[in-house]
Amino acid sequence: MLWHNTIGSGPDLVLLHGWGFSSDIFETLVDKYKNQYRITLIDLPGHGRSDDVNGGINEWCNTIAELVPNNANVLGSSLGGLLAMKIASICRIKNLIVVGATPSLTCNDNWQYGMEVETFMKFADDLKQNYAKTLRRFVSLQTKDKTLMRRIFEIIDKYPPSSSALTQGLSILLETDYQELFKSLDIPKYTILGTLDM
């Protein structure tokens, strides 16, 4: 079962967090927008307070899709962005917003904007050796703000992801290429990238 919580009132906004985190990562966003939107927070499979879901991206997205209100705005961050792309293809949503996510995390012959596969595989190997240390290193790549970094570590430590969910999430990130799917979505799509995402 996936943990989810709905807060606020207004148009529906579903928030999908990234790899290794929980929906608590959105606490500042929720505080700011809960009076303008009815916000649905969902912990991804094996993350936060959610149980594991066996399988890959299709199984994860089918499970998440059951919690997405009709005509919702869906915002996904990183891995959550990739999942949001798939969910947009199986649910009726109003707008798709992806933050720090592209249709393919890794480079390939048709996509030059991702991470080199070798770099990704090194990260995956490090995860097998010491997932807590690797997750902390991953966070340190996201921000240099020490206060924010401490808060993110507190969120991760409060609800650590399962090792199987971390492995499944990395497999999804490595194997998924949604360039064609993303182009085919006939809804408004917004991509937000930071300096370190370029």
Feature-to-residue mapping (PLM):
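Conserved HGGG/HGGXW glycine-rich cap/lid loop of the alpha/beta-hydrolase fold
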Residues: 2-51
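The conserved beta1-alpha1 loop
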Residues: 14-18, 77, 193-194
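Conserved acidic catalytic loop of the alpha/beta-hydrolase fold
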Residues: 58-72
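Short beta-strand immediately N-terminal to the catalytic nucleophile in serine-hydrolase-like folds
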Residues: 74-76, 99
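Gly/Ala-rich beta-loop-alpha elbow adjacent to hydrolase catalytic centers
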Residues: 76-80, 84
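Flexible "cap/lid" loop of the alpha/beta hydrolase fold
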Residues: 90-129, 165-168
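Conserved alpha/beta-hydrolase catalytic His-Asp/Glu region
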Residues: 128-176, 180-181
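Short beta-strand/loop motif that positions the catalytic acidic residue
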Residues: 184-185, 191-197
